[in-house]
């Protein structure tokens, strides 16, 4: 795994630690107006690190967005939302809707609306599905660009939740789209291989395990 991949792989403990630090500096900024600017600068730095280390935790995004608003940084808040939409796999039409919006007024509302309809947590996301949502998700997976590793990871976890719910054929179908955009996703190759093995599709299973072995030579997937 290269250095960029390491940075983009979720590290929950570090994310939580930096978010706690950001929260502490926000409290200090509120308590001491004379040092508000300095403390908010530290809060923003830690909030950015929290998102960097764990983009899968909605609290980290919320923390960063709140600090941006407290600093009256509408442009910065717009960039936070744009980055979040990329992670959520939103298409270009939805991204274009962010243009011309007063983000200081509605930025936090847009953030919360995104989490309600498109939670980063795979369990919350799956439990919110109703009606034609699964079909819409399927169509979405087939047309979106998943070259951003963060989006690839988020959608990979959603597909795993779909597989657990019994939609194995749908998992096998859609996972191909994610792997086509990001063939270095060893976790998805491993899950796909295990599924093929459970289904007694041995040739397909070994093809997946071969990919894992090439990506992570130290893993003894063939044993």
Residue ranges and their predicted role:
Residues 39-50, 137-141, 171-178:
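Amphipathic alpha-helices of TPR/Sel1-like and other helical repeat/solenoid scaffolds
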Residues 56-57, 183-186, 217-221:
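Short coil/turn motifs that N-cap or connect alpha-helices
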Residues 68, 162-163, 196:
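The core hydrophobic/aromatic register in alpha-helical repeat solenoids, strongest
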Residues 42, 49, 83, 174-177, ...:
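The canonical alpha-helical register within tetratricopeptide repeats
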Residues 1-28, 32-35, 79-173, 203-206, ...:
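Intrinsically disordered, low-complexity, charge-biased linker/tail regions
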């Amino acid at each position: 795994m290269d250095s960029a991949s390491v940075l983009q792989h979720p590290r929950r403990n570090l994310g939580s630690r930096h978010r706690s630090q950001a929260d502490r500096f926000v409290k200090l900024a509120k308590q001491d107006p004379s040092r508000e600017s300095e403390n908010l600068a530290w809060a923003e730095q830690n909030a950015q690190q929290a998102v960097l280390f764990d983009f899968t935790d909605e609290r980290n995004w919320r923390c960063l967005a709140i600090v941006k608003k407290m600093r009256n940084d509408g442009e910065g808040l717009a960039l936070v939302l744009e980055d979040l939409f990329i992670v959520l796999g939103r298409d270009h039409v939805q991204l274009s809707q962010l243009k011309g919006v007063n983000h200081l007024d509605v930025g936090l509302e847009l953030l919360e609306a995104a989490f309600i309809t498109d939670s980063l947590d795979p369990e919350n996301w799956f439990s919110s599905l109703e009606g034609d949502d699964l079909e819409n998700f399927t169509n979405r997976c087939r047309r979106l660009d998943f070259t951003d590793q963060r989006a690839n990871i988020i959608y990979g976890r959603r597909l795993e939740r779909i597989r657990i719910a019994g939609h194995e054929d749908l998992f096998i179908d859609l996972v191909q789209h994610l792997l086509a955009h990001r063939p270095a996703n060893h976790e998805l190759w491993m899950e796909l291989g295990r599924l093929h093995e459970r289904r007694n599709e041995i040739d397909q299973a070994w093809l997946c395990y071969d990919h894992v072995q090439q990506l992570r030579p130290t893993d003894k997937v063939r044993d």
